[in-house]
């Protein structure tokens, strides 16, 4: 807060090797406790992502801890990640969110996410993927570079912004030197690597 940030996202970044799609109750419990304390201490907008692709669990954590959004990978269209095949989760996720009464928890969906192969969807553009997130009732799209710490291409951000009316957040590689390059196309910046030392 003192540094001028508007929000925080909690993520089990170093819980490697990541499980695919589902995590154990100990991860859910830990993320809920951490998230609740971060929200209480900061008073900021707080989101959560549970790797890898544990989107249902992330929504449950956000709901239980009073957080504002869950970041979801594999929301629209499938892809191959480090962990294997990641299916689209939008249908299950939105129904689960409604079932537990968590409608106030926003879903921020990665499009053509980092650390993944998108060969199976090469005929679908980044803009079309963003359109699909909007069609599937996502609340925001997250655009990244190809890996953690690498920024997205400016033209990719512009394409996404031109194809949907959702909040466009940038999810990797943003720092003090390149942040201005992405105005006015980006609405939010998730800054992690730039603030860390040796990855922590």
Q: Where on the chain are the PLM-derived regions?
A:
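Conserved anion-binding
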Residues: 63-140
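Glycine/small-residue-rich loop that forms an oxyanion/phosphate-binding "nest" at active or ligand-binding sites
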Residues: 31-79, 85
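Catalytic cores of alpha/beta
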Residues: 53-66, 129, 160-166, 170-191
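Active-site mouth loops of central-metabolism enzymes
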Residues: 1, 45-54, 109-127, 170, ...
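Glycine-rich, proline-tolerant flexible connector loops at the mouths of alpha/beta enzymes
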Residues: 7-30, 76-82, 138-152, 196-200
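Alpha-helix-loop-beta-strand connector modules within alpha/beta enzyme cores
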Residues: 19-48, 88-109, 152-175
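Hydrophobic faces of well-ordered beta-strands that scaffold small-molecule active sites
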Residues: 8-10, 46-50, 70-72, 105-111, ...
């Amino acid at each position: 807060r003192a540094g001028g940030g508007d929000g925080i996202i909690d993520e089990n970044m170093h819980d490697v090797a990541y499980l695919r799609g589902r995590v154990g109750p100990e991860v859910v419990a830990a993320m809920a406790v951490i998230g609740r304390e971060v929200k209480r201490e900061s008073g900021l907008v707080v989101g959560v992502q549970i790797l890898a692709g544990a989107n249902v669990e992330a929504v449950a954590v956000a709901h239980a801890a009073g957080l504002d959004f869950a970041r979801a990978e594999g929301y629209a269209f499938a892809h191959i990640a480090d962990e294997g095949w990641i299916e689209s989760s939008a249908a299950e996720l939105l129904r689960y969110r409604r079932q537990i009464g968590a409608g106030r928890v926003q879903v921020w969906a990665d499009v053509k996410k980092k650390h993944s192969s998108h060969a199976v969807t090469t005929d679908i553009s980044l803009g079309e993927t963003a359109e699909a997130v909007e069609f599937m009732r996502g609340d925001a799209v997250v655009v990244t570079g190809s890996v953690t710490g690498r920024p997205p291409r400016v033209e990719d951000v512009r394409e996404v912004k031109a194809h949907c009316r959702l909040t466009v957040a940038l999810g990797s590689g943003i720092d003090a030197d390149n942040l201005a390059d992405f105005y006015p196309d980006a609405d939010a910046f998730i800054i992690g690597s730039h603030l860390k030392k040796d990855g922590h």
